[in-house]
Amino acid sequence: MKPYLDLLQHVLEHGAEKSDRTGTGTRSVFGWQMRFDLNDGFPLVTTKKLHLRSIIHELLWFLQGDTNIGYLSDNQVRIWDEWADDNGDLGPVYGKQWRRWTGPDGVEIDQMQWLVDEIKRNPDSRRLVISAWNVGELPQMALMPCHSLFQFYVVNGKLSCQLYQRSGDIFLGVPFNIASYALLTHMVAQATGLGVGDFVHTLGDAHLYSNHFDQARKQLTRTPRALPTLRLNPEVTDLFAFRFEDIAIEGYDPHPAIKAPVAV
């Protein structure tokens, strides 16, 4: 995970001090790209322990088109709690946009189903794009999309994915985002009969919150360990049929977790 650690180091040393929506303060850079060959292991940060349960359940929640935290709460995942209303609702966030994007005529579009069908139909398409940035519904969202747009690319029987993330909380959020979209790439590849290529992560405002500096420095003192391996149940070929038990991460041997506050 050298690309991720390089980003941490660069922002600590060269980032610009900026104010932010949460009032915490950040150090940030604009425009950064990381590339991970998914054949070299599953890109899960090893210099601190990540909560795999949260990463997997959140992605499954997105893919079901859900926008209420009930499913997450039932599975001991708390990462969206701070933004939910009293009924557990978040408004038309990621799951709604991925599965039920509402156009100006009121017609809903299942972007993810279209994507799977189009990869099978026309793998050389340059239009294999999913967007969560539905301008007309942004005001209704509890949190506007940070990972806002992603594109797939097929060559030599391998599927690659590039994510554009407008805003990246480098210490807490970005490791989750890397793992989540790497997992999604594997799942889409299996659902379309392809192998995996690269995951490319492009960040707009890549920032460290001021109350994460010490934790980032601590993480940089640790030596990365071997990447784990992802195993998907080979019998699942429908992207929307994956369940938690169909996904296994083997050989994950991280350093201990490093706690840090979430900026809300």
Curated annotation (Swiss-Prot):
User: Which residues bind (6R)-5,10-methylene-5,6,7,8-tetrahydrofolate per the record?
Assistant: 51, 169, 263
User: According to its UniProt record, where is this protein located?
Assistant: Cytoplasm
Q: InterPro entries recorded for this chain?
A: Thymidate_synth/dCMP_Mease, Thymidate_synth/dCMP_Mease_dom, Thymidate_synth/dCMP_Mease_sf, Thymidylate_synthase, Thymidylate_synthase_AS
Pathway recorded for this protein: Pyrimidine metabolism; dTTP biosynthesis
Q: Which SUPFAM superfamilies match?
A: Thymidylate synthase/dCMP hydroxymethylase
Q: EC number(s)?
A: 2.1.1.45
Q: What class of enzyme is it?
A: transferase
Q: Does the keyword GTP-binding apply?
A: no
Q: Which GO terms describe its biological process?
A: dTMP biosynthetic process; dTTP biosynthetic process; methylation
Keywords on record: Cytoplasm, Methyltransferase, Nucleotide biosynthesis, Transferase
Q: Which residues form the active site?
A: 146
Which residues does the record give as dUMP binding sites? 21, 126-127, 166-169, 177, 207-209
For the keyword Cytoplasm, the answer is yes
UniProt GO cellular component terms: cytosol
Instruction: Name one molecular function that GO assigns to this entry.
Output: thymidylate synthase activity
Q: Which reaction does it catalyse?
A: dUMP + (6R)-5,10-methylene-5,6,7,8-tetrahydrofolate = 7,8-dihydrofolate + dTMP
Self-association state and partner proteins as the record states? Homodimer.
User: Which PANTHER family does the entry mention?
Assistant: THYMIDYLATE SYNTHASE (PTHR11548:SF9), THYMIDYLATE SYNTHASE 1 (PTHR11548)
Q: Which family does it belong to?
A: Belongs to the thymidylate synthase family. Bacterial-type ThyA subfamily.
Tell me the function of this protein: Catalyzes the reductive methylation of 2'-deoxyuridine-5'-monophosphate (dUMP) to 2'-deoxythymidine-5'-monophosphate (dTMP) while utilizing 5,10-methylenetetrahydrofolate (mTHF) as the methyl donor and reductant in the reaction, yielding dihydrofolate (DHF) as a by-product. This enzymatic reaction provides an intracellular de novo source of dTMP, an essential precursor for DNA biosynthesis.
What name appears for this protein in its UniProt entry? Thymidylate synthase
Q: Which organism is it from?
A: Xanthomonas oryzae pv. oryzae (strain KACC10331 / KXO85)
